[in-house]
Amino acid sequence: MVDVLYSFVNVTQRFDQLILNPLYIHSLDMTSMTMKSYLDRIYSIDNQLLDRICQNILPRIHHQVNELIVEQHSMEHVIHTINYPQLFSLSLIDFQEEILLNYLIDNMTVRKLLTEQITCLKIDVKDNITALPLRENLSTIFALILSLCKGLIELNFCRFYHRSSICTFELSSTNCKSSTLTVLKISVKSFDDCLYLLDERLNCLSTLIIYVEEIAYTLGTIDNTVARLTMFNH
């Protein structure tokens, strides 16, 4: 999307006014997917194009962007070059676990944005083809997000069909709580992980869409204290 937008910028002044009109541009997708196979996808845009967009487009539209989709490679350029005062929806696409975790722990710009502005968040963690994913990392990332995002309403956490990223809370010592989250989409390892989410931790949850990797006998019991839960899909 953004590469097409850039191709129309600076054609004429009148055309710029039309293309960059705040009535039309509210969502900005800073990815460009190249699909080698169903499981092998690249989301990065060309470096030269990225630089031009950050220099020529973002300063002109940053104040009107409500929704932003950004991948790991362009994160530094897009998030750190300019602020987005109207941004409330953020999608972080194709991130490595460790890099995403570092952003959540150490990057003050990202932490401030999540804490003060974001109400809708999508997280896509890329598959590790050289080693098994560290599922405890995912549970830590999940807990950090709930802790940081004070006004989070909707969260899509690693719920993408072409990914194998699965979250588990079996080994986690983190305490996942949110008093604002109403919609959660997530992939988990076992039914026990599902039970973990259905207690007082997410007391405002009304919609839970969950993929459970392993459906097996469990000693746990469903103690659903999420009084507002009206939709449960697995």
Residue ranges with predicted function:
Residues 1-234:
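Eukaryote-biased activation of long, low-complexity terminal tails and linkers
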